[in-house]
Amino acid sequence: MPMKNFGNLLLACMAALLGACAGESAGKCDAVVRIDADSVVNRGYIGNGVQWDPYALDYGKGRVEISDADWAKLYARLDFMRPAFIRVMTNTTSVVRNGRLDRMRGFEHLSHILGYCQSRGVTVMFGDWGGSLMDARAGTVNRTLLDHAAAYVAWLVGEKGYDCIRYYNLVNEPNGFWSAADGDFDLWAKAVSYFRGRLDAEGLAGKVELVGPDAAIWGPEEAWWVSRSRDELGDRIG
């Protein structure tokens, strides 16, 4: 709702309240409307958050293009939302061809997203959904692909200048049977430890932090993923 409309609605509500009071004796009207714009309710609140991912626009039936006008409309809507934090998830496998990292593959989509965040000072949590980063059945991590993932984010931050990327989310919902980790904490932690080393080797120590597990938790029985990550991974996650 635009601020002007919100202000009008607030005034209308106050007028209705005062009108109701006017219909009664002054002694019976003790309602007080107070707006405190100075007190901070929660200092940890940083604002709205958005999930905004780049997707392939070719599904085998012709490529779909996003026009400049469409991008402008999207930007305008985001400006209205004023997000302070945006999660951007990709698949490293999408930028690897014939075993080599192809940094420019799909960049025309990703650049619009990161460009918006960089220009507006929005903090980005970049990440990989987890596909092929590990083999839960074999209990192994794909170090080659993790190397590519680290090199890719280092290129985005260093060469392309997207230092809005402050965090990295390795594997979506690792506690789930549907995830690449298949609920195996030790396997996920092994990948996190290795990847942290690769980020540091790429010069991202102190620049990009690995986040704890974005575990899908619907009850207290899965909360141990967070506490165990804190206890066992320490400063490898930030």
Residue ranges and their predicted role:
Residues 12-22:
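Hydrophobic h-region of N-terminal signal peptides that target proteins for export
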Residues 1-2, 168:
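N-terminal amphipathic/basic-hydrophobic helices that include classical n-h-c signal peptides
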Residues 21-167, 176, 182, 186-220, ...:
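Non-catalytic accessory regions flanking glycosidase/transglycosidase catalytic cores in CAZymes
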